[in-house]
Amino acid sequence: MAVPEPSMPLSRGGPGSASLSPPRGDRTLLVRHLPAELTAEEKEDLLKYFGAQSVRVLSDKGRLKHTAFATFPNEKAAIKALTRLHQLKLLGHTLVVEFAKEQDRVHSSCPASNAEKKKRLDDTVENDKEKKEPDVLTVENGIAPNHGLTFPLNSCLKYMYPPPSSTILANIVNALASVPKFYVQVLHLMNKMNLPTPFGPITARPPMYEDYVQLHAPLPPTSPQPPEEPPLPDEDEDLSSKESEYESSDEEDRQRMNKLMELANFQPKRPKTVKPRHVRKKRKIKDMLTVPSPASQSLHPVLLPSDVFDQPQPVGNKKIEFNISTNVPAALNKDLETEQNNEEKNSDSPDTGLDDSNTGFGKLFPKPNVNITEEIKEDSDEMPSQFISRRELEKGRISREEMETLSVFRSYEPGEPNCRIYVKNLARHVQEKDLKFIFGRYVDFSSETQRIMFDIRLMKEGRMKGQAFVGLPNEKAAAKALKEANGYVLFGKPMVVQFARSARPKHDSKEGKRK
C-alpha cells in the first residue's frame, strides 16, 4: 500500500517532543486512531509496510480501541516509521504515533495477533502430519471409499493364494455366471492385459499345476458360525457316531469334487436358436370371404362342402309336357306334332325363338325367369374371381329406412349419369385395393380398353380426405355400380355413391343447346 509521506515531519525539538523521544533501547510504537473501516489484517499489513517486524492489533472496544503496537527490528527503524506515520491522514482519520510506555508494554508482550495464532496452529498441524507414520493409509486411500469402505487397509495383511486347480477354476466360473458385474470386470481386465477375447471357440486346456504336483485336499464347505454360548454336549454321545460323521463328510467332499471336475471338463452346449416371433398380419376382405383350407396335418379325412351340404340342382329350361287323352280332335293332333318338332329344333339351337306363324292352341311353356338366370351366371362367374359378389353387396348394404335416419343421406341426389362415380364417407382404413375389390366387378379385365378406363383415385390427405373417384368403362356400368354399392358398409361406415359432376365438359352441353 503506497502511502504519501507528510510534507513536514515533526522535529524532536518542537512541541510534544517529549512523547516522541524514544527511551534508550526502545523499538515499540503505539499507533492510535486507526480507521475503523480497516480490518485487523489490513491494519497489520499497513504497519508492516512501514517496516514493523511484529504487529499486535487491539480490539475495537475499550480504552485502547483502534490502536496497535508495532515492534521494529531496531530503534533507528522505529524512529523512521514514527516520522512517516505521525499526523498522517488516512480515510478521514489522523494517526497519532508515539513510543510505547512501560505500562503499555504489558499489552504488547501478549501474542502478536489472531492471524499469527492461526499461522502457528497451521504450522503445528502440518508438523504433526509430517510426524505421522507413512505406513498407515488415510481414509481417502482406504479400501473403497466410493462404496462406503472408508477404513484403511491393514498393513500387516498379506495374501498368499493357492495355485489354480480345476476346483478353484470351476468355482470362479460359477461366480462369473452368477454375478454379471464380476463377469464385466473380468472382461475389462482381460482387455487391459491384451489377452485374447473369450468370445471365440473353446481354446485348448493348458497344463495344470495339479497335473505335476499333488495338491492338498479341498477345504470343506464353510459352516455357519456357532452361537456365542453353545449348548453343552450330551453325555450319551459316543465316539463312534463322531467318527461316522467325519467319514460321511469326507465322502460328500469327494463326490462334490468329482462333480466339479465333470463340470469343469464339460463342454458347453450350443445356444438354442430362438425363432423370430411371427407377427400376425391383418386379414384382407377377400381373405375373410374365402373359406380357409383345412390343415393338411389333421388326422381326420378332408370333407368337401358337397359331402356336408345338399347341392342345389342347376336350374334350367325344363320340358313341360301335357298328357292329352286319345279322344283329341285330329286338328289338335297335327298341332301337337308340329309343336314337338319345333321343340326339338329349339333344344338343338337354343338361340332361335318360337315361331309365331303357327296357328292353333299349341303347348304352353313357362316364361323363363331372366333374373334367376342372370344371378346364376353372375355368381358362377364370380365364384373363382377376386371381386365381391352381388349377394355380399346386398348383405352389406343398409336399408332405405336407415338411410333416411343418417345425416349423410339426407340431401342425397344421384346426379347426372356419366362413366365416373364419386364415393364419400369412407373410413380412414380404406385403401385403393378395397375399392378395386368392390368396383372391379363392373369391369371386364379381359378387354384392354375397359382395363385402361378403369381408374381409382382415393384422397387420403387434405380437404378431400375420405373421398374417392372411380372411373368405369361406360355409363351403364357406372349406373349399376351406383345402384348396388350405394349404402354398402365398408369398415363400419356406409358409402355414399353418386355420379361425378366433372365427368362431362361444359362445351358439350352448349353445343347441344345450339343444335
UniProtKB/Swiss-Prot annotation:
It is found in: Nucleus. Its main location: nucleus. Residues 218-230 have a biased composition (Pro residues). Pfam families: RRM_1. It comes from the Eukaryota. InterPro entries: Nucleotide-bd_a/b_plait_sf, RBD_domain_sf, RBM40_RRM1, RBM41/RNPC3, RRM_dom. Residues 27-102, 419-502 form the RRM domain. One of its GO terms (molecular function) is U12 snRNA binding. GO terms for biological process: mRNA splicing, via spliceosome. Residues 1-26, 107-133, 215-254, 337-369 are annotated as: Disordered. Residues 115-133, 337-348 have a biased composition (Basic and acidic residues). The modification Phosphoserine is found at S21, S108, S349. GO terms for cellular component: nucleoplasm; nucleus; U12-type spliceosomal complex. SUPFAM superfamilies: RNA-binding domain, RBD. Keywords: Nucleus, Phosphoprotein, Repeat, RNA-binding. Participates in pre-mRNA U12-dependent splicing, performed by the minor spliceosome which removes U12-type introns. U12-type introns comprises less than 1% of all non-coding sequences. Binds to the 3'-stem-loop of m(7)G-capped U12 snRNA. Component of the U11/U12 snRNPs that are part of the U12-type spliceosome. Found in a complex with m(7)G-capped U12 snRNA. Interacts with PDCD7. This is RNA-binding region-containing protein 3. The lineage of its organism: Eukaryota, Metazoa, Chordata, Craniata, Vertebrata. The gene is Rnpc3.
